[in-house]
């Protein structure tokens, strides 16, 4: 490996919306610089999880070091730091941008700028990164690079005269991109003599070596013999090894300011080496940590229950192991009268929730029932105290509480303007408050709304895509809590409260939601040999009810003609048995019923 001086190091990342070709471009850069031999190449080389490849998204960050000989004959070290493009993982993105001096903005030459790209570009501009626009997929028949250049200039305000046209699929334009990184991205600050500070921009759990931490040295130097201090968690470690990603790990003795590498120090859990934390030397610690560290706060909560009660310990072990590699996942045990033992889990967003659920089912072979997602409500009690509620079933009684506040988000939706009406209708249905509308170009519009987060976490994204035939994209950020007239809607099945089906809804919507929910459950719960009443209630008031009629078992089938009193006796015996069955009978609620709470908005229920 070449030990390049700071002036010949370039740290950059790639910003792109899902599907705009970021991982493919990263593959080409690795191939063109000879970092990965052609025979070892596989698509989406830096996306290590099968789940990432299948969904075509980047979840965990990766990094790769490339050696590149520029047109001036000098050899440069290019560190590519891969970033996730999804809104749920925006904190990880902001940390990886802090580790760079430049960014390639990859825009699909046929689709144009999308919402999440924009959010990440603004983060990049906040971090003073040099942004190089790249128009990808110009080999597609629908590509229109000139229109997209205008769009980028209009929306982001970037000068696109020297935007690089490329096709990551065929490799066209890739050498120009590498040269542009050398020419236009500034080298890191020469801070070798300052106290050592390194930024953690990612970490993952290795079952044999503990947590492997990816970091960028901001100032000073780190050698493999050092003892280090993590400034936010206040933990100290003796280093086992440090090295570089090329893209496979290679040990080195020392890394200095400007370089990107990894370290292993027998760290037990990812939570001990949080993204955004600062590494410094124990012998000569820095005075203050690097700015911008915050702990990931879960936004969306749901209950996870095993379908078989004896799988509960397996689920607990699986969550323990998953938390080692996913510090944003929070969970605590929960019991439910309908479902038995399980866990209440907190996630960054809906995508994060789906991914965790899928990883639990796939990697740990579990069969799970997932309750409808909810958000954290702030309940102001009559005695002046404040209670945070993440499980609708635990909402305090109306007599004890004064008001309920729910989290609101500022939502920006980008779409072609013919879908304007459909999107405004959707936001209105979801209790959205109209803020602004801007025309970006003659045929694309930005809608800005403020909405309750609870209305977004169910199926807002799916509905938005459905109503715009997949053309709209959205981006949201939290703006705080607001008071609303909210009530707890309980569902009673056969007289018993099914706590896993409890939701918190707006008072004006309660009747419609309750009515739609009981009707939906009627379709989904299998018939029994006794009548099952299904009711929706607010407090002690039943607002909607229906019932599933019993299956009639013909006890008279064996009586051919004969005495009427014999038949009466059999029918009486059956009625008695049904009465006992109704009193004792437990109704099994299938998984689809719990998801019914989510799908209500499709059927026009709310």
Swiss-Prot record:
Principal location: membrane
PROSITE patterns in the record: G_TR_1 (PS00301), G_TR_2 (PS51722)
Any Gene Ontology biological process: translation
Membrane topology field: Peripheral membrane protein
Highest taxon of source: Bacteria
CDD domains: EF4_II, EF4_III, LepA, lepA_C
Pfam families: EFG_C, GTP_EFTU, GTP_EFTU_D2, LepA_C
One function term, GO molecular function aspect: GTP binding
InterPro entries (alphabetical): EF-4 (IPR006297), EFG_III/V (IPR035647), EFG_V-like (IPR000640), EFTu-like_2 (IPR004161), G_TR_CS (IPR031157), GUFP (IPR027518), LepA_C_sf (IPR038363), LepA_CTD (IPR013842)
Documented EC number(s): 3.6.5.n1
Group of enzyme by EC: hydrolase
Entry annotated with the keyword Nucleotide-binding: yes
Localisation per UniProt entry: Cell inner membrane
Record key words, sorted: Cell inner membrane, Cell membrane, GTP-binding, Hydrolase, Membrane, Nucleotide-binding, Protein biosynthesis
Annotated tr-type G domain residues: 7-189
Residues reported to bind GTP: 19-24, 136-139
GO cellular component: plasma membrane
Function: Required for accurate and efficient protein synthesis under certain stress conditions. May act as a fidelity factor of the translation reaction, by catalyzing a one-codon backward translocation of tRNAs on improperly translocated ribosomes. Back-translocation proceeds from a post-translocation (POST) complex to a pre-translocation (PRE) complex, thus giving elongation factor G a second chance to translocate the tRNAs correctly. Binds to ribosomes in a GTP-dependent manner.
Family the UniProt entry places it in: Belongs to the TRAFAC class translation factor GTPase superfamily. Classic translation factor GTPase family. LepA subfamily.
Protein name stated in the entry: Elongation factor 4
Gene: lepA
């Amino acid at each position: 490996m070449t030990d390049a001086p700071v002036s010949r190091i370039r740290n950059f990342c790639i910003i792109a919306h899902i599907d705009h070709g970021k991982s493919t471009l990263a593959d080409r850069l690795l191939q063109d610089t000879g970092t990965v031999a052609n025979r070892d190449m596989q698509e989406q080389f830096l996306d290590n999880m099968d789940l990432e490849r299948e969904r075509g998204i980047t979840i965990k960050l990766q990094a790769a070091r490339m050696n590149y000989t520029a047109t001036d004959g000098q050899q440069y070290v290019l560190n590519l730091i891969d970033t996730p493009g999804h809104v749920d993982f925006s904190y990880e993105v902001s940390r990886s941008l802090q580790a760079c001096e430049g960014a390639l903005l990859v825009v699909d030459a046929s689709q144009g700028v999308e919402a999440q790209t924009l959010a990440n570009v603004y983060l990049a501009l906040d971090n003073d990164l040099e942004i190089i626009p790249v128009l990808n997929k110009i080999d597609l028949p629908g590509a229109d690079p000139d229109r997209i250049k205008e769009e980028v200039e209009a929306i982001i305000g970037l000068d696109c005269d020297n935007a690089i046209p490329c096709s990551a699929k065929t490799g066209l334009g890739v050498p120009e991109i590498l040269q542009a990184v050398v020419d236009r991205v500034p080298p890191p600050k020469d801070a070798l003599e300052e106290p050592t500070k390194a930024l953690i921009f990612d970490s993952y759990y290795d079952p044999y070596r503990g947590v492997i931490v990816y970091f960028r040295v901001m100032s000073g130097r780190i050698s493999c013999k050092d003892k280090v201090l993590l400034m936010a968690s206040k933990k100290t470690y003796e280093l086992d090894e440090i090295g570089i990603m090329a893209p496979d790990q290679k040990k080195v003795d020392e890394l200095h300011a400007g370089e990107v590498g990894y370290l292993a120090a027998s760290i037990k859990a990812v939570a001990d080496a949080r993204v955004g934390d600062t590494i410094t030397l124990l012998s000569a610690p820095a005075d203050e940590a690097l700015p911008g560290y915050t702990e990931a706060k879960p936004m969306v909560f749901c209950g996870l229950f095993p379908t078989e009660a004896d799988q509960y310990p397996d689920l607990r072990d699986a969550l323990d192991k998953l938390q080692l590699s996913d510090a944003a996942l929070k969970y605590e045990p929960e019991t439910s009268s309908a479902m038995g033992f399980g866990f209440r889990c907190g996630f960054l967003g809906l995508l994060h929730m789906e991914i965790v659920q899928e990883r639990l089912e796939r990697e740990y072979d579990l069969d799970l029932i997932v309750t409808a997602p909810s958000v954290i409500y702030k309940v102001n009690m009559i005695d002046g105290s404040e209670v945070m509620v993440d499980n609708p079933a635990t909402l305090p009684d109306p007599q004890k509480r004064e008001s309920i506040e729910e989290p609101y988000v500022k939502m920006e939706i980008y779409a072609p303007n013919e879908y304007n009406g459909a999107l405004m209708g959707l936001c209105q249905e979801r209790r959205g408050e109209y803020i602004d509308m801007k025309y970006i170009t003659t045929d694309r519009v930005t809608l800005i709304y403020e909405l309750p987060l609870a209305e977004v976490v169910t199926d807002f994204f799916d509905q938005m895509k459905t109503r715009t035939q997949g053309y709209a994209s959205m981006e949201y950020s939290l703006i705080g809590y607001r008071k609303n007239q909210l009530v707890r809607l309980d569902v009673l099945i056969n007289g018993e409260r099914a706590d896993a089906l409890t939701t918190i809804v707006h008072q004006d919507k309660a009747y419609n939601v309750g009515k739609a929910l009981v009707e939906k459950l009627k379709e989904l719960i299998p018939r029994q040999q006794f009548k099952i009443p299904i009711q929706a209630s607010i407090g002690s008031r039943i607002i909607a009810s229906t019932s599933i009629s019993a299956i009639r078992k013909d006890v008279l089938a064996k009586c051919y003609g004969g005495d009427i009193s014999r038949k009466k006796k059999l029918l009486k015996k059956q009625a008695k048995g049904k009465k006992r069955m109704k009193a004792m009978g437990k109704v099994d609620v299938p998984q689809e019923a719990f998801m019914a709470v989510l799908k209500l908005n499709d059927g026009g229920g709310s």
